[in-house]
């Protein structure tokens, strides 16, 4: 390798790097980029001292694009001789000038410098002295184009970097030089170990950016794979912020939850808990410049966000079990439950092979710590109340943890979503409970946590959330009423207290369904002729349940009963008429529509008989 540049060039270059690392908040308030501009001036001086680019290197053409930087553009060769060494050093300077301009929000100028860097390096891109810088320049161009929302261009640069890394490791394999080494004397060059660490970090960044690009392109399977690989590599190379790593792992768990891959989701969440526990305990490094624990609000927010991911895990696993075991009216099907019990052994037998295929985080003590968390949490669908209760209690623990940060004062929407998840945990647990009185108590708990929210919320600002809560409270009262009716049916002679309770629950359900339906009216209190797609199904369900509730009111007054039947018929008729004029609505409520048609046919006859009976008395 040629001799290192003279001391003046080396000193100016090192001074430029030092200024580049100065954090923006340490600059004067009116000159936030003062250190960046200082670094830029020094880099331009270094470029002038190095002299012009070698004559055999052409300037990049105006239409140079990411495809021109792909691996197929000319055969790479070793960077030997003074001309090649000067080209390499100029490329390093161009790279830092590019990053500098991007940092000061001058994206076009930054792009020009980075493209020039690639142009200088292209003949040597696979050599020991160039490959790391070439990948870094392409990574930065990938980020730049991503910020411009030119995702395909970003993807091309980043995939080119990934391919170059793979080709280099396959054909050469030895740790390449870090770009800064081109400005260091021989005795200050990095060790092989440090070179390897830095190069692997560059590749990890490449995978991280690719994960984001694939996510943006809605290639979710690929995005999850790259995110998982990034997180794994960060642990292997001990290059991560505990708080950031944990939130990324918890976020990845949501992908696996949606895919119903509960073992993988549990692994991500368990790892998130363990790594989050390191926050503030790891000494500051280049990768973690400040102790994250020094930011208490961010710490508690991230803790709350991870807790919410755990809630979703527990809730989705329980709901998936319910879907697998319920009959056509939403009750526990004992035959399906028995079938799933028989499958349990097979699921347990498959666990080991699934675990071997999955990407595991950590080794040694870290792996043991993650496994210790995993072992306390089930990943198989609960098949009875005791198993479901285990998940419910875990979910409820994380509800309390999430609510510590996401309070109604300051985090209205987040707080309400956590409360709704808490309510949903009670609702799905009630499915596994055989005792109807205990099920009633679970719905009562739901109502107790949801009703206060209706007082705190201004529907003018939180209309959508208000509707969701009104509908959910109405449904909870509706379910309680059905349970009380079922309890009364088992009694030979229900007393007046039970009748009064049924009517009270009926009245409360009607109140909240009506509040929901009234929220759909226009400022003149007129119900819409066309119901929006986003509220069509809930609106039709509310109408159907209101019709059914009026038919369930228990009264000794014949006149009142006739009025209730007429109101019930009116709501059933609304559903039938609306679906006739809006065929798309029929697809949303097929079962309810058939029942409504039946009731529209039967109720008038029932009402006529009732009137005839009244006339005789």
From Swiss-Prot:
It comes from the Eukaryota. It comes from Mus musculus (Mouse). Pfam families: KBP_C. Its main location: cytoplasm. Interacts with KIF1B; positively regulates KIF1B microtubule motor activity. Interacts with STMN2. The keyword Cell membrane does not apply. GO terms for biological process: cell differentiation; in utero embryonic development; mitochondrion transport along microtubule; nervous system development. The modification Phosphoserine is found at residue 174. The lineage of its organism: Eukaryota, Metazoa, Chordata, Craniata, Vertebrata. Activator of KIF1B plus-end-directed microtubule motor activity. Required for organization of axonal microtubules, and axonal outgrowth and maintenance during peripheral and central nervous system development. This is KIF-binding protein. Residues 48-83 are annotated as: Disordered. Gene3D superfamilies: Tetratricopeptide repeat domain.
């Amino acid at each position: 390798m040629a001799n290192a540049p003279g001391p003046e060039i080396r000193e100016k270059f090192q001074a430029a790097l030092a200024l580049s690392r100065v954090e923006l908040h340490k600059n004067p308030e009116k000159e936030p980029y003062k250190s960046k501009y200082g670094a830029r001036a020094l880099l331009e001086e270094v470029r002038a001292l190095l002299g012009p680019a070698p004559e055999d290197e052409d300037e990049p053409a105006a239409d140079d694009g990411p495809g021109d930087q792909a691996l197929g553009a000319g055969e790479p060769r070793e960077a030997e001789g003074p001309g090649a060494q000067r080209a390499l050093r100029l490329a390093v300077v161009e790279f830092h000038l590019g990053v500098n301009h991007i940092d000061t929000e001058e994206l076009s100028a930054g792009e020009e410098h980075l493209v020039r860097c690639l142009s200088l390096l292209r003949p040597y891109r696979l050599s020991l002295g160039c490959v790391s810088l070439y990948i870094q320049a392409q990574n930065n161009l990938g980020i730049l184009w991503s910020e411009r929302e030119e995702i395909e261009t970003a993807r091309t640069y980043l995939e080119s970097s990934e391919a170059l890394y793979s080709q280099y490791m396959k054909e050469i394999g030895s740790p390449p030089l870090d770009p800064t080494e081109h400005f260091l004397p021989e005795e200050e060059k990095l060790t092989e170990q440090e070179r390897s660490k830095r190069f692997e970090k560059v590749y990890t960044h490449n995978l991280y950016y690719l994960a984001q690009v694939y996510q943006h392109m809605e290639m979710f399977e690929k995005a999850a794979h790259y995110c998982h690989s990034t997180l794994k590599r960060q642990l292997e190379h001990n290059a991560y912020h505990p708080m950031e790593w944990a939130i990324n792992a918890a976020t990845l768990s949501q992908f696996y939850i949606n895919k119903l891959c509960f073992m993988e989701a549990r692994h991500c969440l368990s790892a998130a808990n363990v790594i989050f526990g390191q926050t503030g305990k790891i000494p500051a490094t280049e990768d973690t410049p400040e102790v994250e624990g020094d930011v208490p609000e961010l710490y508690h927010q991230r803790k709350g966000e991870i807790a919410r991911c755990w809630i979703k895990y527990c809730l989705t696993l329980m709901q998936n079990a319910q879907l697998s075991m319920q009959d056509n009216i939403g009750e526990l099907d004992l035959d399906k439950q028995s079938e799933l019990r028989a499958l349990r052994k097979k699921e347990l037998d498959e666990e080991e092979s699934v675990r071997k295929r999955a990407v595991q985080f950590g080794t040694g003590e870290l792996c043991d710590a993650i496994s210790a968390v995993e072992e306390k949490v089930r990943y198989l669908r609960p098949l009875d109340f005791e198993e479901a209760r285990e998940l419910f209690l875990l979910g409820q623990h994380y509800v309390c943890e999430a609510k510590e940060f996401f309070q109604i004062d300051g985090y209205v929407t987040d707080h309400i979503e956590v409360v709704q998840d808490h309510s949903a945990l009670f609702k799905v647990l009630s499915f596994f409970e055989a005792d109807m009185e205990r099920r009633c108590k679970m719905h009562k708990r739901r109502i107790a946590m949801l009703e206060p929210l209706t007082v705190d919320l201004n529907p003018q600002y939180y209309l959508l959330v208000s509707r969701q809560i009104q509908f959910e409270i109405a449904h909870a009262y509706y379910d309680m009423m059905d349970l009380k009716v079922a309890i009364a049916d088992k009694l030979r002679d229900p007393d007046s207290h039970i009748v009064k309770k049924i009517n009270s629950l009926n009245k409360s359900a009607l109140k909240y369904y009506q509040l929901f339906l009234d929220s759909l009216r226009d400022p003149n209190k007129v119900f819409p002729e066309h119901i929006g797609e986003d509220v069509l199904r809930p609106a039709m369900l509310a109408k159907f349940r209101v019709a059914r509730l009026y038919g369930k009111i228990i009264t000794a007054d014949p006149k009142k009963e006739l009025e209730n039947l007429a109101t019930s018929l009116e709501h059933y008729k609304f559903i039938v008429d609306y679906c006739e004029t809006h065929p798309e609505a029929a697809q949303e409520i097929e079962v309810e529509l058939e029942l409504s048609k039946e009731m529209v046919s039967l109720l008038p006859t029932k009402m006529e008989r009732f009137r005839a009976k009244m006339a005789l008395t």
